[in-house]
């Protein structure tokens, strides 16, 4: 829990070493946070960028994620062409997205897939400023 000037928020993260096989679901994580901290605004650090609908249904305020490396290959005015698992034209490839009261910020990141070179997709580090 972070606190500043009497305002509190939860900063939580998803443990995701082997993907969905061994990580908590967004619902499980949201239930644990609510039980421990009540209904505080929550910033979720989540590796996977393709679950915005689930994050929003759980009531997370802000989700910071990556995973798709910006779509690996990018074209101007089109965006990412190839996503995780070979998904063609991933929707949440880079940028800011809204669903209900949830804001998801997706970074293109610094790394690359082991078997693919990044084309038209410069590495990216984001600075996110929170304002009340």
Predicted segments, located by residue:
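Soluble catalytic domains of enzymes that build or remodel membrane lipids, polysaccharides, and related
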Residues: 1-132
């Amino acid at each position: 829990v972070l606190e500043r000037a009497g305002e509190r928020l939860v900063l939580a993260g998803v443990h995701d070493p082997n993907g969905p096989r061994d990580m908590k679901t967004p619902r499980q994580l949201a239930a644990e946070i609510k039980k421990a901290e009540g209904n505080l605004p929550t910033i979720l650090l989540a590796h996977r960028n393709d679950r915005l609908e689930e994050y929003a249904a759980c009531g997370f305020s802000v989700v910071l994620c990556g995973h798709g490396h910006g779509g690996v290959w990018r074209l101007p005015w089109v965006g990412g062409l190839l996503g995780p698992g070979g998904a063609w034209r991933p929707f949440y490839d880079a940028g800011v997205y809204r669903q209900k009261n949830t804001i998801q910020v997706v970074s293109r990141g610094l790394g690359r897939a082991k078997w693919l070179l990044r084309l038209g997709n410069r590495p990216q580090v984001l600075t996110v400023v929170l304002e009340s």
